Amino acid sequence: MYSPGAGSGAAGERKLCLLSLLLIGALGCAICHGNPVDDICIAKPRDIPVNPLCIYRSPGKKATEEDGSEQKVPEATNRRVWELSKANSRFATNFYQHLADSKNDNDNIFLSPLSISTAFAMTKLGACNDTLKQLMEVFKFDTISEKTSDQIHFFFAKLNCRLYRKANKSSDLVSANRLFGDKSLTFNESYQDVSEVVYGAKLQPLDFKENPEQSRVTINNWVANKTEGRIKDVIPQGAINELTALVLVNTIYFKGLWKSKFSPENTRKEPFYKVDGQSCPVPMMYQEGKFKYRRVAEGTQVLELPFKGDDITMVLILPKPEKSLAKVEQELTPELLQEWLDELSETMLVVHMPRFRTEDGFSLKEQLQDMGLIDLFSPEKSQLPGIVAGGRDDLYVSDAFHKAFLEVNEEGSEAAASTSVVITGRSLNPNRVTFKANRPFLVLIREVALNTIIFMGRVANPCVN
């Protein structure tokens, strides 16, 4: 949340608050009404003038960039868009590890690192000095070679187009952004324009000062609508008050149909073995067929299940029973994950996977501070002069919230159930490899061409919901 700095003057002065709310659902590319940019997806850099108050250029090439600089850029992909996708993946694994360290090993985790990056990229539009530098470093935007902080927004627009504007509509991947600002404030015109053109985030005025509770209800209703009712009351009572000036909301909703569905007739209750040694019954789905698979270091199994259309997949990472999932989480890096994915090959498998749903919500503040995003949350140090007109420098982020939802079931393609994998009854074929997710595992949902991690999480206890 954005708030005025301590040196801003009188007690009770207005504060500017940012809430970053992240969900799973259906998404569309930024559509800008009443803007000279007719189609952001075919626009050139000169068509989208991004003129923030401050610009940051990385002092030198990062070692992490050098590590992957020789990798082949996907076909018909701008190199900088590809590097942005890689930067988002670096942030994803780094943030996930910080979050996992703060959680109990028996807790489920689910988040959209892409949604978090998007929300803070919009915040970066108004940042200066060390606040801008820390945003560039923590979110790994500084690993994009030879480009400045203002150009990141153009690449985000192109990345969003690649992710959300698909010819294949068999899977719903939808993102929505909105700025809710207090009607008594005048917001920087450039900040509003770029937020709308690049991120599709229109500014909606609300009366936080006189009607904070009604404003909270309005925002929660907007979030519920954009997530098909999956996320409700995301902003708790009291989070918005008469001092609030701005609430930034980002939502992502995903619903995918399996390319090869699990037959409900093959689902049966089986035990799931939790970290604490206890077990609980879960509906365990089952199918046999060819999937991309690999047994990697120390017996960890990696399985990729495609959604219809093949452009988005779910990746499951299952340690062997003798190795804890926490150990795999600690060792995971973007480079190691990419190595595992590159090694996947078509394998005849017997797949056992629990049917489950999970919802996770938490504050982002503590983890981001631990990662080095210090000034943004400090009333004394934050520099966000590019958000409110007049360049006022008394704004800071008091908190940011994330919420995500995932449901996995047997559903496959609605009209094309006859896919390349034939579903059979349960068997004991000794010649087929078994992938049985009856113990804690990692789950990722990614876009294949750019290897963009859209969602990431841990299923440690599928019995809770």
UniProtKB/Swiss-Prot annotation:
Listed GO CC annotations: collagen-containing extracellular matrix; extracellular space
Residues the UniProt record annotates as site (Reactive bond): 426-427
Signal peptide start-end: 1-32
Chief location category: secreted
Post-translational modifications: Phosphorylated by FAM20C in the extracellular medium.
GO biological process: blood coagulation; regulation of blood coagulation
PANTHER family (alphabetical): ANTITHROMBIN-III, SERINE PROTEASE INHIBITOR, SERPIN
Molecular-function GO term, any one: heparin binding
Positions of glycan attachment: 129, 168, 188, 225
UniProt cross-references to Pfam families, sorted A to Z: Serpin
Tissue and organ expression note: Plasma.
Positions of post-translational Phosphoserine modification: 69
Disulfide bonds: 41-161, 54-128, 280-463
Record-listed heparin binding positions: 82, 162, 178
Protein name: Antithrombin-III
Subcellular location(s) per record: Secreted, Extracellular space
Described purpose of this protein according to its UniProt entry: Most important serine protease inhibitor in plasma that regulates the blood coagulation cascade. AT-III inhibits thrombin, matriptase-3/TMPRSS7, as well as factors IXa, Xa and XIa. Its inhibitory activity is greatly enhanced in the presence of heparin.
Family of this protein: Belongs to the serpin family.
Annotated positions of the Phosphothreonine modification: 64
Keywords: Blood coagulation, Disulfide bond, Glycoprotein, Hemostasis, Heparin-binding, Phosphoprotein, Protease inhibitor, Secreted, Serine protease inhibitor, Signal
Top-level lineage group: Eukaryota
InterPro entries for the chain: Antithrombin_3_serpin_domain, Serpin_CS, Serpin_dom, Serpin_fam, Serpin_sf, Serpin_sf_1, Serpin_sf_2
